[in-house]
Structure formats: structure tokens, C-alpha cells
Amino acid sequence: MIADPILAAIPWDQAATMIDLEGRVPIIGTIRDCAMHFVLYKPHARDNARVVLTQPIHRIGRQTRTWLLEPEEIAQLAERLRREAN
């Protein structure tokens, strides 16, 4: 089961953009596309990856919503994708 139920609610077909903090070319596609590409990244690139959402999500313990997913959250989505594919 995915650690964060908020991440589990993000649909695979939601539009998203994966960016790299080092300025590489972004991946524009869906959450599924971003999760698939994240798995292919080397550890250094994973640490610098972020996903910009088209719909903000709530954060536990915060009053505001966010448009950005951190590497740990992208890894959870990649794990969810792996489990659902099997």
C-alpha cells in the first residue's frame, strides 16, 4: 500500500511535468510518464527531480496545497506503478 493516501488519489492520466533542478529538458506528459521516467534515472538525477502538477494536492500538517512533488513522493508513485503493473 502506498504510504501517502493523498498520492494514491492522483490519477495516472493527470497532466504533469517532471523537471530537473540542474536545468535539463523537462518531461511533459502524465503522472504515469513521470513515474516511468523516474525509475530510469540514476540516483543523482532522482535527487534533483521534481514533478509539477496541474492540480494542487493537500499536505498533511499544512494549511496550503502544493503543486510540486518531491523525489520521495515520486518514488512512492513509481512503486505504486510497479505494483499495479504486476
Residue ranges and their predicted role:
Residues I10-P11, P43-A45:
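A generic structural signal for short, solvent-exposed coil/turn residues
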Residues H44-V51, R82-N86:
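Short, surface-exposed secondary-structure junctions/capping segments
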Residues D47-E70:
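Short, structured protein-protein interaction patches enriched in aromatics and acidic/basic residues
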